[in-house]
Amino acid sequence: MSNLIIQQNAELPTRFYPIVSIGTGGIVRDAHYPAYAKAGFTVAGLFDLDREQAHAMAQKHSVPAAYDTLEELVVNTPADAIFDVAVPASAILDVLEKIPDERAVLIQKPLGENLAQGREIVALCQKKKLIAAVNFQMRYAPFIIAARSLIEQGIIGEVHDMEVRVTVYTPWQMWPFLEQVPYAEILYHSIHYIDLVRAFMGEPTGIYAKTVRHPDVMKMDGSCTNIIFDYGDVQRVNVETNHQHKYGLRHQESYVKWEGTRGAIKAKMGLLMNYPDGEPDAFEYCVLQDGESPIWNTVDIQGTWFPDAFIGSMSSLMRYVEGSIDTLPTSVEDALRTMAVVDAACQSSAGGATLIEG
């Protein structure tokens, strides 16, 4: 094990295509642009409905052009540019209609407000022959890449158990629009973990789920969620989120854990703890050895979910465009499968549990 190589970074494209931004809100400010700067990607232009914000972002991040209309951006966009769309889910269809056919687009998740809208988005992308991916960037967080590296090398054997547990305090007041979103926690947070589970475990046959409100945020349609994925009688997969643990850092938890026939991996997601300051990530793995007590090994992870994962989601699209990979991992078609699981979780929560007789 001393010579074990654990990959942590996403593979970059050979060619760096210019990027143009549609929408420059908090996620772009805090993650997209820091990631692109770190990778060496160039943002050629941007547009936001808030003109003042757009020009401020252009000045801060040395973007050469801030356009006052989407139409103006489209006309002036280089022919080989990637459209980086970070707008509310309800606005995705309207934006895609205005993007020229046969162009490359990276769309901020979720893929619409619901499964039906997701299907409309996929149909439009196919009609316009867009090379379209969804920014499910958690797949490319350094600790996730490290876990996949170990699993693909067979280090922990066959994975039969995957668990995501989040017990943190999330200041939902930072995103007031979520008060208007049905099943907000599932659609805007647990969707990360649903997509991650699919990426590692494949397609579940069904879902058991319940999302509940919390007395502190009754206006929000769900802030704590339990999801059980049905992968048959041998694999256990679940997601548990409690965003209202307001009792200090001591008992906060935020991790992804994989257990296999030969070992296990546990990755701490420090970003979500003590939010928005965060805590350091941590990565450990254990490999069983005959006749020996289990030993957990610690790996120093370089980089974090925000912003480093956003390098990976953009890189995978660029690599597909340049032809260095044959499959687009987070294509809109694949993302629609994640939306189908999200929809099933919402339906399960609404449908309720099996009633107890007596």
Where are the regions that the model predicts?
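C-terminal helix-rich "cap/oligomerization" subdomain common to oxidoreductases
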Residues: 1-15, 81-85, 316-358
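N-terminal Rossmann-like dinucleotide-binding module
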Residues: 2-61
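Contiguous beta-strand/loop segments that form the cofactor/metal-binding neighborhood of enzyme cores
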Residues: 2-5, 188, 194-276, 311-325, ...
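Beta-loop-alpha module in the N-terminal Rossmann-like domain of NAD(P)-dependent dehydrogenases
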Residues: 65-124
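Hydrophobic residues in well-ordered beta-strands that form the structural core
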Residues: 107-108, 132-134, 163, 239, ...
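Rossmann-fold dehydrogenase core element
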Residues: 120-138, 157-164
